[in-house]
Amino acid sequence: MSGIIKKGKDSVSKNPYYMISLSGAYDSQSFWKAKDIEETDNILNKPGLDCIYTDCTDISGSLYFCSDEAKTELEKRLAHIPVNALHFIDSGDYHYVSLLFLQRINRPFSLLLFDHHSDCMESAFGGGLLTCGSWVLHALENLPNLKKAVLVGPADEDKTAEQLLKDSRITWVTEAE
């Protein structure tokens, strides 16, 4: 199945949240599928909130890394999702999808990332391939509107990325700090 599924009784609310499924991880979770408020106490199922679910599980070349073909297809399928919305992006294996939203921001901005990894390493696959571990580096190198990245939570040993970049636009707050 591919496409968009709206969860809600009538029309889409002014402030829906968006779930992007790449692995099918949400299929076994019920918090976003409840039909009635009584079915869950989850905050995402309160009146006035709608879930827009975008199924991208049929896109190959997207697990851990993003091939050029997968990136093109994801950009098409995610074009309906506003940048300034709440996005649930599958698992950490697909962190790079954040870059697809960041590249649509057309004014100066800062990135605040809470993660155990910096996600700003050069691709282990070479050739500048976009991966779940390299998307912040891609953003810093290619998005002129990204003025600062604040990374909160990387392991102390992940400071190798900071040495690699020597970029004054990055602020680190490691897990030990």
Language model feature labels by segment:
Residues 3-177:
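Conserved alpha-helical scaffold segments that buttress catalytic/binding sites
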